[in-house]
């Protein structure tokens, strides 16, 4: 592992993490890793006998401030299987001007599989944050994962009434864009209270499963998972044009949405 960590401690972070995996036998392995502070990875581990490699992503700086630019460039060679998690919730601190930005580029080659399941991101009031995902899938490659955002430090009674959050997703199959989305929220009291925006809720989640084609039976299974928890109107399910599944959450509990998304990833996916 190489680490380039010579930085000015008073300057914004400009850091990248580059990883590559292959699968020469039963187990997926990390074969290349280049890191820059404050980004790190824990040693890979294998919690079961499937050969899936689990990698925990770390941010040792404690959070992002205005002007920080963090990038993840990850390649999975053919038949690799990797689950990415994070050690703790991400934190985006308030900024008087510059944006914080994080970009994730995933290249998933033939027959490889990715599960992307980090902890939530907490966006402080008055923060400015841009999150970008670009996922490129080759033939028979699979992706499932989520993004969970908490707006404001609600444990302190803070609301997201000032600030700006943007999220961009692009998922490609070869040279075809199979799913893309742009989200944007500009903090205000009106946004917080509007039934067409946050409706007083503080947590948003998006789950994307492009690991298989979903028929109505699988959609029904997904609905049963949601309804069995006693949650109803703040979840939504959508089939994409390529028969992938998108689930959405609007509520107040990061633990609730993580539990539901975890069940979806375990029960209805191969």
Swiss-Prot record:
GO terms for molecular function: nickel cation binding. The gene is ureD. UreD, UreF and UreG form a complex that acts as a GTP-hydrolysis-dependent molecular chaperone, activating the urease apoprotein by helping to assemble the nickel containing metallocenter of UreC. The UreE protein probably delivers the nickel. Belongs to the UreD family. Keywords: Chaperone, Cytoplasm, Nickel insertion. It is found in: Cytoplasm. Required for maturation of urease via the functional incorporation of the urease nickel metallocenter. GO terms for cellular component: cytoplasm. This is Urease accessory protein UreD.
């Amino acid at each position: 592992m190489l680490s380039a960590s010579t930085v000015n401690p008073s300057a914004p972070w400009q850091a990248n993490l580059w990883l590559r995996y292959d699968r020469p036998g039963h187990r997926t392995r990390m074969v290349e890793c280049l890191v820059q502070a404050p980004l790190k990875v824990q040693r890979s581990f294998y919690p079961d006998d499937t050969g899936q490699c689990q990698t925990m992503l770390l941010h040792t700086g404690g959070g992002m401030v205005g002007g920080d630019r963090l990038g993840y460039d990850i390649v999975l060679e053919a038949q690799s299987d990797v689950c990415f998690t994070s050690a703790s919730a991400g934190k985006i601190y308030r900024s008087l001007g510059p944006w914080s930005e994080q970009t994730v580029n995933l290249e998933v080659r033939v027959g490889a599989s990715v599960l992307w399941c980090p902890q939530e991101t907490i966006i402080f009031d008055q923060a400015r944050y841009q999150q970008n995902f670009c996922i490129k899938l080759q033939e028979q490659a699979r992706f499932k994962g989520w993004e969970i955002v908490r707006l404001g430090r609600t444990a302190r009674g803070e609301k997201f009434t000032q600030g700006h959050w943007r999220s961009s997703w692009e998922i490609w199959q070869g040279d075809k864009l199979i799913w893309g989305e742009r989200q944007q929220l500009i903090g205000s009291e009106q946004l917080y209270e509007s039934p067409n925006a946050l409706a007083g809720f503080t947590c948003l989640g998006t789950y994307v499963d492009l690991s298989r084609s979903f028929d109505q039976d699988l959609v029904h299974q997904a609905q049963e998972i949601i309804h069995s928890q006693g949650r109803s109107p703040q979840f939504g399910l959508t089939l994409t044009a390529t028969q992938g599944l998108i689930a959405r959450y609007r509520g107040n509990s990061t633990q609730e949405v993580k539990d539901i998304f975890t069940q979806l990833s375990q029960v209805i996916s191969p």
